[in-house]
Amino acid sequence: MKNTRLFMFAACTLFLAACGRQTVKIMTPPDASNRVLFGAEQLQATLDKAGYQVMMQQGDTTFSDAEIKTILLTEVNDTTLKKEGFHISTTGNLTRVSGRDGSGVIYGCRELIDRVNDSDGRLNFPEELKDAPEMVLRGACVGLQKMTSLPGHGVYEYPYTPESFPWFYDKEQWIKYLDMLVANRMNSLYLWNGHPFASLVKLEDYPFALEVDEETFKMNEEMFSFLTEEADKRGIFVIQ
């Protein structure tokens, strides 16, 4: 009986705590790009973790409730912003994140995310802020090569196979890595291999050029499709 009372007390406490959470609304336009939606998802995850009740609204971007903290994400044709640049403005309970492009919106969201994380969850948003990356390409290089030559292959010949590069086929790890690149405002991923075409391209006139079996080739196609799609919605170019 005592344990039952303790359980009910704990449940009621959690319920009341949830009811008392501040609500934050994130609004995106009906035609929001994948990058804008990705920025919204990243922001939502951070606010959820910080203890806020997050409402996602795509379509109507009218600021209709001044009592609710609202974040509006939009792409704008603002020539005063550089490529990948953003403008954050806050008036009352409305914070606007305007990006010159989808990447600009992502970086504007990252600015808000950093401020939430650096202030113990407080919504310390700037009244006015414009910023943009200084360098055109900012990225990381991942080597798909080894320190020694493979038996039966020449220099720089390292076919993409699960046996040689098992980590390359780990989608969950790639998601974490791509998110890390975004958090550091990187926009390019360089996959370094001296001769990648033998693992990725089939030519009718040169069937012998393919150095992996059909199953591995299809696996490589699927992985590159996955990797480029996930990278693109984060504003990242995959350069092979």
Where are these regions (language model features)?
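Acidic, contiguous N-terminal accessory segments
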Residues: L6, C19-G92, R122-P126
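Residues embedded in well-ordered secondary-structure elements
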Residues: M8-F9, L129
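Low-complexity, intrinsically disordered regions enriched in charged/polar residues
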Residues: F9-A10, L37, G99, I106
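Amphipathic, positively biased hydrophobic alpha-helical segments used for protein targeting
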Residues: A10-A11, S119
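Hydrophobic h-region of N-terminal signal peptides that target proteins for export
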Residues: A11-A18
